[in-house]
Amino acid sequence: MIYRLVFIALLISVLPSCTHEFSLNEVDAERKIVLFCMPSTLGDTTLIQVARSRVIHNQGTNTDSKPFLVFRLNGEEKEIHYTEVFTGLLPARSYYVVEKLKENDKINMEVSYPNLPVAKSQTVIPQAFPLDKSEVVLTDGEYGKKIQFRIAFTDSAEAEDYYGMRVIKKTSTAFFQPENSDSDTIKYTSVDLNLDNEPLFSEKTGFDDIFDISKEYYRNLYIWDDSKINGKNYTLKVDTYYDAGYENEERKETIEFKIYLYKLSKEMYTYLKSLNRINNNDLGGYGLAPIRSHYTNVENGIGLLGGCNVYESEWISNPKE
């Protein structure tokens, strides 16, 4: 169960903080429904976060009216649950559906509030990530040893495909003396991968090339499309610094990795790409480039309904020298 909790926490982290209000500062903006939902094949719980935008210049009072939600899976309406408090698995004041999803499942959603147009959206769970083989190996780097993640996969030539990758590092510290066992710890962190030698990520154009600006990926979720590899077999290679862990007379620290590979719907890929553009738009803050906005696929609203098919590896031991 802890692995599912880690994944849901990571999934939530790529979404904006969503409470009862979402501010819009455009002078001509109107209140809109805000919907964020990212159905996936991992686990059986689909989180739904719903709110209403609040126009900053509008000084009117807010109401406590509840939204009305409809969640249809392949045309069949499903029961929607609600939690008022944080559960350890779900955020406070969030909705959720308990249903195991699979590839090609079609999800339609509707959200309505009094005096607001009904917000609608839809998505489809993509086919599975076409993984052929994954490896975690120790290699020589410019400044010492490094860990390289190699992902071999076969892209389909029949459609446009969208992918993602994220690596989680687990650091476990265990004390040898029984009286210190309560101090044992486990820490999970997302891995900041070096992309410089991977052609799918490292190409720079325009201002990025002129000013040698490196692209960063929001929350270390690395995404790409198949425009360079359509219909081909390909091995993606990315790396990070080598942390050997340690062991002494008192304690032992061990390192493990878990790889998440995503097949993304076009909607979800486009949304994540817009997040990356916004976070990398340093020049926009100086008036040298246009300020970009978030992508949305919610009709009469704001937000995202985007599906993904997730591959989750087992925990992989740290390579040894």
List PLM regions with ranges.
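Sec-dependent signal peptide recognition
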Residues: 2-8
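A sequence/structural signal for flexible, mid-protein segments enriched
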Residues: 19-321
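N-terminal hydrophobic targeting signals that begin at the initiator methionine
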Residues: 1-2, 19
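C-terminal motif of bacterial Sec signal peptides marking the signal peptidase cleavage site
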Residues: 14-17
